[in-house]
Amino acid sequence: MITTEKKKKNKFLPDFEKQSIYSLRYDEMQEWLVEHGQQKFRAKQIFEWLYQKRVDSIDDMTNLSKDLRQVLKDNFAMTTLTTVVKQESKDGTIKFLFELQDGYTIETVLMRHDYGNSVCVTTQVGCRIGCTFCASTLGGLKRNLEAGEIVSQVLTVQKALDATDERVSQIVIMGIGEPFENYDEMMDFLRIVNDDNSLNIGARHITVSTSGIIPRIYDFAEEDIQINFAVSLHAAKDEIRSKLMPINRAYHVDKLMEAIKYYQEKTNRRVTFEYGLFGGVNDQLEHARDLAHLIKDLNCHVNLIPVNHVPERNYVKTPKDDIFKFEKELKRLGINATIRREQGSDIDAACGQLRAKERQVETR
């Protein structure tokens, strides 16, 4: 729930007149109902309308009294996302550009796999981490998203899938923004979509990725939720990583590894390292050996990413043969590694690219 105290802690949260009803966890909805003279069991009815029947209006919650519906309308907004652009790839990937109620835009991606449908969600409008290969950072950070705005991304995609009787089975928090810079809202989002009264998406079917905000890695290690954890690494040496990811100047690789080791000691869970391959920068066999040496004592997996070209950035794709050689070298050194399947290569698939293109149109 967005309280005054939470807004003070998170200065980048929006100051809307009404909170999104989707921002409330199940326990918070129960608490709110009791505080307003209602019975606790109404929370189950409300969540069923929101997440199973997926109604668009509080007035559609017909088994609630008119008085309760009015109280809900007086206090909460039904967050709606307006689809500005929808791009569909020949491989079935769909990229949405959504407009928020204050006019800002965000991206959400639906990816189709043999094992189900995965949604990549955004946690911030823009990003201030400044990764030099990423379109998300163009224009900087505008604000954080409420938990309800993150939930609404999944719900909006799920409503689109309802027409073909499909469901969202996996969530990856790898869209625009640094999730650990919007930590409390991200955690509320995770608990909402994981709740069996809500979308009931299993914790092990959800992955959160960070650029390496070390204090929050320690916090995340203490959370009682079995979410998959990924770290955008991209280089094993500080010199290269600092050029790719300026955040590394604050959180050096050795300190990042200490935090990850702590996370594994606390959770006994595997970590995925995301490693984007940039031609002539971090894609040589010596870089593979540096990486293997850095992570050899960790329970981990390396996800090698053939990067999407971003016109505003100067990096180039590593040739396919070199990608395979890099993977082979890691495996030779005992590291579990795979090459991520490229999806959406014929649309604006790079993170933040579609939003950046729309911003260019707006400013012409």
Curated annotation (Swiss-Prot):
EC number of this enzyme: 2.1.1.192
Disulfide pairings: C120-C351
Radical SAM core domain ranges (all copies): 113-346
InterPro entries: Aldolase_TIM, Methyltransferase_A, RlmN_N, RNA_MTrfase_RlmN, rRNA_lsu_MTrfase_RlmN/Cfr, rSAM
Keywords of this entry: 4Fe-4S, Antibiotic resistance, Cytoplasm, Disulfide bond, Iron, Iron-sulfur, Metal-binding, Methyltransferase, rRNA processing, S-adenosyl-L-methionine, Transferase, tRNA processing
Keyword Amino-acid biosynthesis appears in the UniProt entry: no
Domain of life: Bacteria
MF annotations from Gene Ontology: 4 iron, 4 sulfur cluster binding; metal ion binding; rRNA (adenine(2503)-C2-)-methyltransferase activity; rRNA binding; tRNA (adenine(37)-C2)-methyltransferase activity; tRNA binding
Swiss-Prot/TrEMBL cofactor(s): [4Fe-4S] cluster
Cofactor comment: Binds 1 [4Fe-4S] cluster. The cluster is coordinated with 3 cysteines and an exchangeable S-adenosyl-L-methionine.
Active site location: E107, C351
Record HAMAP family: RNA_methyltr_RlmN (MF_01849)
Its biological purpose: Specifically methylates position 2 of adenine 2503 in 23S rRNA and position 2 of adenine 37 in tRNAs. Confers resistance to some classes of antibiotics.
Protein name as annotated: Probable dual-specificity RNA methyltransferase RlmN
Source species: Staphylococcus haemolyticus (strain JCSC1435)
Gene: rlmN
